[in-house]
Amino acid sequence: MPIFYESLSDNLRDWALRQPLFFVSSAPYRGRHINVSPKGLPDSSFAVLSPSKVAYVDSTGSGCETICHLRENGRATVMFCSFDATPRIMRLFCTGSVIEWNDPRYAGYVKRMGVKSLVGARAVIILDIFKVQISCGFGVPLLDLTVDPETNEPKPCFTNRPRLGKFAEYTINRGELPEYQMQWNSRSLDGLPGLHSAMRDKGEFIWWAHVTNWASYYHFQLDIIKTGMALMFLVMVVAQWVGYVLYQW
């Protein structure tokens, strides 16, 4: 079951900096492409500036999705996960901004982060945390060693953790799976409708879920229509006022 915090504690900060990589996801408001970028070198490019603010040095790459999305809507999520014996997933839900390499503030942020500016770095990404989510990570594979049959040399490999399957089996045997799904799978973090079977078990109407999804999907167009109607009303009021003034003359 997930646990939520408003900021990073010292032990979560230290754990994050020990991980070999992290992931950054972002998306435009209306575009089709949702971006996920793996980032290496967290110990030398990622920094925790305060319990509610983190930053990382962004290297030049073949795309610029995160920077573009942050400048459009300021939304990003950072995820760390453990590949060792102790499983964990940590997500940092953030709002962010971009400090480019030629910005006068860039050198100051790099110094504050306590990292060396990477060769080819193009920006520092500043992220303000508004929610921290911790979950079990039992579905993340374990990094292990095996023997290459051709060379007889050890090589890294991924092995599945048995805990997730055992948890599901235990929950099913106790008849607790529907209750678990009702609690954790019926809604998203933002309240969007989720698993229909879980919603039915909670006594919710699926047709209303479809209406909610439709309204969420088309809210941008609805906002444009409402704004257009408000502007039209304002123009009509101004036109009537101008006509009244001219009539008085």
Swiss-Prot record:
EC number: 1.-.-.-
Disruption phenotype: Decreases the production of ustiloxin B.
First and last residue of the signal peptide: none
Known role: Pyridoxamine 5'-phosphate oxidase family protein; part of the gene cluster that mediates the biosynthesis of the secondary metabolite ustiloxin B, an antimitotic tetrapeptide. First, ustA is processed by the subtilisin-like endoprotease Kex2 that is outside the ustiloxin B gene cluster, at the C-terminal side of Arg-Lys, after transfer to Golgi apparatus through the endoplasmic reticulum (ER). Cleavage by KEX2 generates 16 peptides YAIG-I to YAIG-XVI.
InterPro entries with a match to the protein in the record: Split_barrel_FMN-bd (IPR012349)
Cofactor note: Binds 1 FMN per subunit.
Entry's Gene Ontology cellular component terms: membrane
Transmembrane spans: 227-247
Domain of life: Eukaryota
Name of the protein in question: Pyridoxamine 5'-phosphate oxidase family protein ustO
Native organism: Aspergillus flavus (strain ATCC 200026 / FGSC A1120 / IAM 13836 / NRRL 3357 / JCM 12722 / SRRC 167)
Residues annotated for substrate binding in this entry: L21, F22, F23, V24, A215, S216, Y217
Pathway per the UniProt entry: Mycotoxin biosynthesis
Alphabetical UniProt keywords: Flavoprotein, FMN, Membrane, Oxidoreductase, Transmembrane, Transmembrane helix
Cofactor(s) the record lists: FMN
UniProt membrane topology term: Single-pass membrane protein
Ligand binding (FMN): A76, T77, V78, M79, F80, C81, R91, L92, R105, R163, L164
An MF annotation (GO) of this entry: oxidoreductase activity
Record-annotated disulphide pairs: none
